Amino acid sequence: MAFARAVRRPIGVFYYSVSSRFSSGNEYSTVASKFETLSQYKSSVPSGYTSLVRGFGNFIRSFSSEAPPAVSDQMSLIKQLRERTSAPIKDVKASLVECNWDLEAAQKDLRKRGKVLASKKSSRTAAEGMLAVAQNEGKVAVIELNCETDFVARNEIFQYLALAMAKHALLVESSSQQVSGVFPFGPELFEEFKLNLDHPKVNGETTVSNAVTEVAAIMGENVKFRRGFLMSKSSAGVLSAYLHTSPQPGLGRIAGIVSLEVEGENTQLEAIQRVGSELAMHVVAAKPLFLSKDLVSSEAMANEREILKSQAESTGKNQMAIEKIVEGRLRKYFEEVALMEQKFIVNDAINIKTLVDNLSKEVGSPVKVTDFLRVEVGEGIERLEASDEPVAQTA
């Protein structure tokens, strides 16, 4: 702008002196004394002379149009763009300056900058975040949205996106066309899903992938959708969900979901739902790995048996005694990892199998647990602690 002020006056004087001769009419009277017609005079003017004069005029006017607004107006524009985007003030001002203080253009520029920054940060570890749960009559969906810090996980924009994604996850279709059960899905299936957002900072129709990128730009962190699960029930059943460390309904750091199936048309759904809610809470606290001891994987069984046998052999007892020790400890192992064998956290005098049997008697119809799911934010992701030593956390 210093250059503009330096050159504006001499160029303006030149432009004024040339253009005023024509606009005042004096030049035309001089022309009339030398040429019979104005067209003869125009034909005598060197090629490009008129366009040169006109170009100088446009050049001068461009300086006045690019002049920045007053300081008070600048602050108002910065405030408006900051409220619209929640971007850092330095980025807001940089975009406004780049776009000659055009608010709409600066908002588009911020989005472009944000996508570039989000791309650069995508390799950083994102082990914090939130689980979001949505439920309708026949399904429960849970998604995990990750970020780098707990500070961002508590942000209302981040939480709004997580809840919106969970609601849309109810539309995911199982590739196996299964009627009931647990269906896991990842980014490759969900990222191109359409989202219709209605938030002051993120709104309009977009995709899951673009919405995550936009929120990452606003937050200034790596934000990513990691995984999702969909649990469906049969027609005669109940789905119950529990969220631990929940900042608001539908959000939490640990989720437990249980599916109960009842035979026949049972009208005592309230009792079934009560036990279902208690079981979902139990799943979060007790961390079962398998539904029943019959469903413990052969690999897990073999590994545990080998460990228990090695421990028993160190006692120096005979082979028959060792086998009894191993079998006794295996029963303890089942009580730890199999849901139906676990002690009920609300009443440890009974196990889950007894709890469900008592429920069947109460409602007058056989009830069984068909599926359960436990999900925790960041499980299985290597985290860098203060010591910079990676620690693997596996479910």
Swiss-Prot record:
Record carries keyword Protein transport: no
CDD domains: UBA_EF-Ts (cd14275)
GO cellular component: mitochondrion
InterPro entries documented for this protein: EF-Ts_dimer_sf, Transl_elong_EFTs/EF1B, Transl_elong_EFTs/EF1B_dimer, Transl_elong_Ts_CS, UBA-like_sf
Keywords, in A-Z order: Elongation factor, Mitochondrion, Protein biosynthesis, Transit peptide
Transit peptide: 1-63
Transmembrane segments: none
HAMAP family assigned to the protein according to its UniProt record, in alphabetical order: EF_Ts (MF_00050)
Protein name: Elongation factor Ts, mitochondrial
